[in-house]
Amino acid sequence: VHSKNLPRSLAVLFAVNILNFYDRQVLGALLEPIRKEFHLSDTQLGALGTLPIVLYALAGLPLGRLADSGSRKRLLAAGVAVWASLTGLGGLVQSYLMLLVSRLGVYVGEAACAPAATSWIGDLFPAERRSRALAIFMLGVPIGGALSYAISGPAAQAWGWRAALVVAALPAALLIPALLTLDEPARGASETRRPATATAAPPVWSILRIPTMWWIIASGALVNFNLYALATFFPAFLTRYHGLSVGQAGLWAGVGYAVAGIAGGAIAGAWGDRVIHKRKDGRMLSAAVAALVAAPLALIGIRQPAGGAAASIALIMIAYGFLNMYYGLVYSAIHDIVAPAVRATTMAIYFLAMYLCGASFGPLLTGRLSDSLARSAAHAAGSAVVGEAYRAIGLHQAMYVIPALSAALALALYAGSRTIAADMARRDEPGPRAVVQSAQ
């Protein structure tokens, strides 16, 4: 790919990731009207995120292998077509089960995005520019989530939640043609030195022999538990506990996600490329510090009294900004320790673990905890009915899982920082523990 085409390629992939997370998080802004229409518990609401995420995780590995061996461009275009069309069809459902089935299909399409796109970017940009490029790509997470909340909440209040799902599907009509016009780089095109070529082990086992990968996988599960729990229930928390309307909650959550997420991602990208020149563990160590800062900020934000929405939003979203630094820093670290030919497979393994062990539990366990705490609050008050006031108490108390796991995330990242320098050196040394470099 010619250097003049790099900005356009990155811009289109960035736009794909925006739509990816717009459509993935759209239900977060719509949970309250959906709950009331279908008479659902928070556990059932959490399952709308958890069950599709399990399928997403399982689909990611074969799609990652396909991205390493076939056309990433065609795979991405097909994924966009599938997830966008099924998001729109979700606006036609008449039952909770039909909505769940539509979301299962959405997540299968989305499973093609991250392994193929991050592998593509890894082949576009050399190591010294890769952190910024991946950070720009991952800005699609907060921007997509922010747009989803800011547009879908007011749209649902004006026209109903079904219309908001149809709106979410429309940008795909422009993105798919733009994606198909890109030139896909050759695998390993950005490398300035040839990685190790010898290993008898299959790629999956070679990847899992890298000590740092286990800490990265653990960190991925922890960060995704937090961020998916937050994405699912934050607007509902603002509505129930702080008294905002569905439209207000969506708008202010969207603004917070955009400002904090963009700031965190931009800082991570610039800092990650700078610190790697000074110390090989710099990216992992920086991510650990960011998670450590996020924990008390989230704790104080959740502890704000009912009605104190402004302070709560500000503190929790600043914490989110620090957590969002994870992507630009850690995704680049993954590329530092594996060979180009197995990048998509590596990302698929990583996503399998982080979504199956993290994101899949975030919405469901937070929802179950919320239901349990709401029942306890009602029982303590002598009420046989779990009304809206007790649901607000239950969800508020369940949110405390986020700062606790942010602290655990910092520990996992720090542990990974202790092993990454040796793994980066080992990548370029032939031998039984080197990651396979497949013949192209």
Model-flagged regions — what are they?
Residues 2, 186-217, 241, 435:
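Juxtamembrane intracellular "pre-TM" segments in multi-pass secondary transporters
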Residues 27-28, 210-266, 323-327, 331, ...:
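Extracytoplasmic gate region of multi-pass secondary transporters
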Residues 39, 71, 92-98, 126, ...:
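Helix-breaking motifs and short loop linkers at transmembrane-helix boundaries and internal kinks
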Residues 58-94:
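Conserved MFS/SLC helix-loop-helix module at the cytosolic interface between two early adjacent transmembrane helices
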Residues 74-88, 282-298:
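Structural signature of the two symmetry-related core transmembrane helices
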Residues 102-142:
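Cytoplasmic helix-loop-helix junction between adjacent transmembrane helices
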Residues 137-184:
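Helix-loop-helix hairpin linking two adjacent transmembrane segments in secondary transporters
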Residues 163-180, 397-415:
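Symmetry-related core transmembrane helices of the 12-TM Major Facilitator Superfamily/SLC fold
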